[in-house]
Amino acid sequence: MLPATFKLCAGISYRHLRNMTGLRRTAAVALTHELEKLALVGPGPGKWINQIRRKSILLSSRLEEKTLNDVEMSYIKQGEEALKKSLNILGDQDGWKTEIVMENGDKVLSKVLPDIGKVFKLEAVVEKPLDNVYGELVDNMEKMGEWNPNVKEVKILQKIGKDTVITHEKAAETPGNIVGARDFVSVRCSKRRGSTCILAGMSTRFGGMPEQKGFVRGENGPTCMVLRPLAEDISKTKLTWLLSIDLKGWLPKSIINQVLSQTQVDFAKHLRSRMTSSSNALSLC
């Protein structure tokens, strides 16, 4: 009975509803939820239900794609390209040179890549669970200016689908104004693969955000942050941040290298402070 019902919903009813976008999406999501409930009842045809669930999730994904226009789809592809390139860079363990090693174990490394230039990699441990760190960096990204003094503002310009956003970031000038204020327009995507979360991005063009007075428009990417539970203690999070950025302007490479590596070290410090203060605030509620 259930197989026939699924075929009816996904086949006959789909043809009938192909021009009713909201209902299609709602139906696909509802079907997924019902299948999840069935899987918990057991014992039963768990294997078959899992197969149908995967098909329904794929259907829901395809329906979402059909609601996006060509420009939005191009942004999604840019985000996925940034993710792929970033993971390829991080996957190559050869050629990394140490820039900074902190007493707490934080480490910044760098390497020079053809067609990209010098990239930096931060390796740090945050003593909070992955979901907490992910929530701060993704769900609360527009609040980053509250706790990271190197960032003036992060603003979401557009949300595309469930994993992709276009953002405008304003970076503060460095002490002594050695490097003036920069801003960036980026496409960002977030993915979760098992217990690993990946936040990737790269610069993009967005008609609604032309160059701003008082800021030099920089370019970044491919760049990403990889979050995973620390193997020795899953209540802590291992953070790996790949940074690839072009600050533009006439700046000596020595200054750029110093600024970018220090920016990563500072980020880890400020993130820890934010996570600690957030936990303390929750404990007082």
Curated annotation (Swiss-Prot):
Q: Which InterPro entries match?
A: StAR, StAR-like, START-like_dom_sf, START_lipid-bd_dom
The record's GO CC annotations read:
mitochondrion
User: Which GO biological process annotations does it have?
Assistant: cholesterol metabolic process; intracellular cholesterol transport; regulation of steroid biosynthetic process; steroid biosynthetic process
Principal cellular location given in the protein's record: mitochondrion
| Localization in the cell | Mitochondrion
**Sorted UniProt keywords:** Lipid transport, Lipid-binding, Mitochondrion, Steroidogenesis, Transport
Task: Report the domain of life of the source organism.
Answer: Eukaryota
What Pfam families has UniProt attached to this entry?
Answer: START
Reaction(s) the record says it catalyses: cholesterol(in) = cholesterol(out)
Query: From the Swiss-Prot or TrEMBL record, what is one GO molecular function term?
Result: cholesterol transfer activity
Q: What does this protein do?
A: Plays a key role in steroid hormone synthesis by enhancing the metabolism of cholesterol into pregnenolone. Mediates the transfer of cholesterol from the outer mitochondrial membrane to the inner mitochondrial membrane where it is cleaved to pregnenolone.
Q: What is this protein called?
A: Steroidogenic acute regulatory protein
Q: What is the species listed in this Swiss-Prot or TrEMBL entry? A: Xenopus laevis (African clawed frog)
Recorded name of the encoding gene: star
